[in-house]
Amino acid sequence: MSEVNETCKPQACAIQNCLEKNGYNESRCTKCIDDLYKCCKEFYERQGPDASSVCCPKFKLLQLKLKQRSLGEIDAKVLETRRG
């Protein structure tokens, strides 16, 4: 049986806690998300792009997310809807 790699688990859990505390408003958890992406980036730098952690996006997706974040505001926002 293979061992599950939980590298960056504290950062992933911090995102979950932040989202729960803030009504799942991702824009209020930017620092936690950035911390996870930083941890995952360092993980892939050490282990290589084929490494895997249940707490990190795949290498290519992480690269895309980091690029998007460097270009500006990309956090999801909670939109209020009117029912009427």
UniProtKB/Swiss-Prot annotation:
Organism: Candida albicans (strain WO-1) (Yeast)
Pfam families attached to this UniProt entry: CMC4
Extent of motif Cx9C motif 2: 29-39
Sorted UniProt keywords: Disulfide bond, Mitochondrion, Repeat
Disulfide cysteine pairs (residue numbers): 8-39, 18-29
Free-text comment about domains: The twin Cx9C motifs are involved in the recognition by the mitochondrial disulfide relay system.
Position of sequence motif Cx9C motif 1: 8-18
UniProt name for this protein: Cx9C motif-containing protein 4, mitochondrial
Domain CHCH: 5-47
Protein family: Belongs to the CMC4 family.
Record's GO cellular component terms: mitochondrial intermembrane space
Principal subcellular localisation of the protein: mitochondrion
